């Protein structure tokens, strides 16, 4: 997307997100109500909160898997994804083993994604590559390799960040590189540190096709 989206166009690309450890059932119900009001694409919640979000109704539900470290055993990630889908989620955002990517073990990264892909057949699968870490501790080829592994494993999206790592969240450089590597075959979700309308528009113009936002209302209100 190039140029300035309308409020409705931007909202339709947003996963309205709440992943804090202290999140309550009431918080998730309020998140879903706000999501329906704002007209976003989906909400993104922890696996244990999927039933609450589904019961609240009126919006698609995405769940994270292996979040936020990505260090879970692949079979655990697969089980977590399957449980979320059985509870009514339609999309899975999984975290790869970042350490495996950094040391060049792309086969391990690919097989990890394949395990979740098999458990999430028919669902949209987004693969979180923690782009700020991969770009900050190595060079561009590590991020490129991780994105290619996601594509080879059958993912639908690559996603920049958990939003939890001190290295940072989405950047224009990372989104551009990810889009150049796998777009338009895969979508690119920018997430982490997108706090203003200008941030959101910059990510879309860099090639993002979905946005993960926690402060969605403020971002939408900031559109001129």
Swiss-Prot record:
Keyword Chloroplast in annotation: no
Active-site residues annotated for this sequence: 93, 159, 189
GO biological process entries: 2-deoxyribose 1-phosphate catabolic process; carbohydrate catabolic process; deoxyribonucleotide catabolic process
Location in or out of the cell: Cytoplasm
Pathway(s) annotated for this protein in UniProt: Carbohydrate degradation; 2-deoxy-D-ribose 1-phosphate degradation; D-glyceraldehyde 3-phosphate and acetaldehyde from 2-deoxy-alpha-D-ribose 1-phosphate: step 2/2
CDD domains: DeoC
EC assignment: 4.1.2.4
Main localisation: cytoplasm
Reaction catalyzed: 2-deoxy-D-ribose 5-phosphate = D-glyceraldehyde 3-phosphate + acetaldehyde
SMART domains tied to this protein: DeoC
InterPro entries cross-referenced by the UniProt entry: Aldolase_TIM, DeoC, DeoC/FbaB/LacD_aldolase, DeoC_typeI
Class in the EC hierarchy, top level: lyase
GO cellular component terms, semicolon-separated: cytoplasm
A GO molecular function held by the record: deoxyribose-phosphate aldolase activity
Role description: Catalyzes a reversible aldol reaction between acetaldehyde and D-glyceraldehyde 3-phosphate to generate 2-deoxy-D-ribose 5-phosphate.
Similarity comment text for this entry: Belongs to the DeoC/FbaB aldolase family. DeoC type 1 subfamily.
Misc note: Was identified as a high-confidence drug target.
HAMAP family membership: DeoC_type1
Protein name: Deoxyribose-phosphate aldolase
Biological source species: Mycobacterium tuberculosis (strain ATCC 25618 / H37Rv)
């Amino acid at each position: 997307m190039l140029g300035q989206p309308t409020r409705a166009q931007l909202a339709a690309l947003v996963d309205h997100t709440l992943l804090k450890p202290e999140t309550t059932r009431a918080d998730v119900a309020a998140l879903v109500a706000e999501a329906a009001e704002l007209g976003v694409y989906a909400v993104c919640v922890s696996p244990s909160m999927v039933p609450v979000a589904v019961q609240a109704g009126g919006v698609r539900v995405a769940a994270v898997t292996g979040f936020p470290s990505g260090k879970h055993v692949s079979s655990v990630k697969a089980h977590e994804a399957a449980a979320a889908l059985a509870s009514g989620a339609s999309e899975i955002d999984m975290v790869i083993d970042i350490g495996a990517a950094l040391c060049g073990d792309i086969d391990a990264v690919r097989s990890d994604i394949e395990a979740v892909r098999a458990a999430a057949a028919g669902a949209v699968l987004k693969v979180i590559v923690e782009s700020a870490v991969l770009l900050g501790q190595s060079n561009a080829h590590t991020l490129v390799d991780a994105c290619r592994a996601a594509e080879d494993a059958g993912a639908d999206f690559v996603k920049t960040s958990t939003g939890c790592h001190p290295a940072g969240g989405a950047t224009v450089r990372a989104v551009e590189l990810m889009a150049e590597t796998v777009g338009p075959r895969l979508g690119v979700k920018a997430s982490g540190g997108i706090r203003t309308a200008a941030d959101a528009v910059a990510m879309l113009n860099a090639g993002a096709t979905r946005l993960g936002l926690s402060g969605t209302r403020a971002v939408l209100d900031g559109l001129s």
